[in-house]
Amino acid sequence: MSETLLPGSGFDTYEEQDKVLVGMSGGVDSSVAVRILQQQGFAVTGAVIRFSPAHDAAVEAAQKAAKQMEIECIVLDAQELFEQEVVAPFCADYCAGRTPNPCVRCNPAVKFTALLAAADKLGIQYIATGHYARVEVDGDGVSRIHLPESAARDQSYMLSRLDQDVLSRLILPLGEFEKDDVREMARDFGLDCADAPDSMEICFIPDGDYPAFIEARGLAGKAGHFISPDGADLGPHQGVLHYTVGQRKGLGIALGEPVFIREICENGDIRLARGGEEYFTTVTVAGLVTPDGAALPAGEYLVKVRSAAPAQPAVFDGTDTLTFASPVRAPAPGQTAAFYRGGAVAGSGFITHAE
């Protein structure tokens, strides 16, 4: 393939005019990914996924971007699967006092499942997205998600549950770039989306009001009481779906000192803590997966307990327990714990408990 702007590793292994299906949203990241792949000599087809009625604007934007770049953009309808695998569990988690991460669930269960199925149907070998991460093949032939060049835009956490079926066919063209570089490339390419705003965090709830979204579905979180740091009953709260571990604002409580949510109990009570008491050393996880499907070995890892949190050293016991070298803030049940070793994702599990 021709020498062009992408400095990423592994591109010399592809053949001229290899076909790639690019997941598009109409935003700057996926659009620049298309242009980079075109410059690398790939035959690019776009695909936009309709996850819910809230995605109609994204479908229109992706089709507009594809038209400008003179590529076909197919529309994949994943609404039923998205409801089953993402929306319903999201609502159930909040109603039970857990804090879900819908993107981490969606990527393996819906987004990349839909892209692979479409690629297979079209006879396309590779898939690609505009995520900020890298895919590299280790010495054992296992493809793994690696940290991107841009620590500020790192999305490896969101991709931490992908398996070999996806990883062995996945190309991530933006892994070597900073966001500002991507926007500058979009301007150089003359793309209309160059200055488009970044996508929202919860794509199926445009206004971000997830309690209202859940309640509109006829659901309610467990009722219970606030319990003070000293064990006193402070009266009822609004229902657990309105709260998350580590939260300080919006509690509606005045104790004369800052307090945080330390624990959302199974009975619906919410235990509060003074500043500094929302840190934990031991975290239990479930649903562990690894890139190669093998069991995650016991040992030392760097672990992220939230997407934006820095990875922290921890020892995994080989079963379900992490012990951090230093306390980590507010590891919330329902969130993902992403394990890293050597700059690569080694595994991923869901937090069930912290102490």
Label the model's feature ranges:
Residues 13-17, 128-135, 139-355:
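AMP-forming adenylation/ATP pyrophosphatase catalytic core
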Residues 1-160, 171, 180-181, 261:
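ATP-dependent adenylation/nucleotidyltransferase module used to activate substrates
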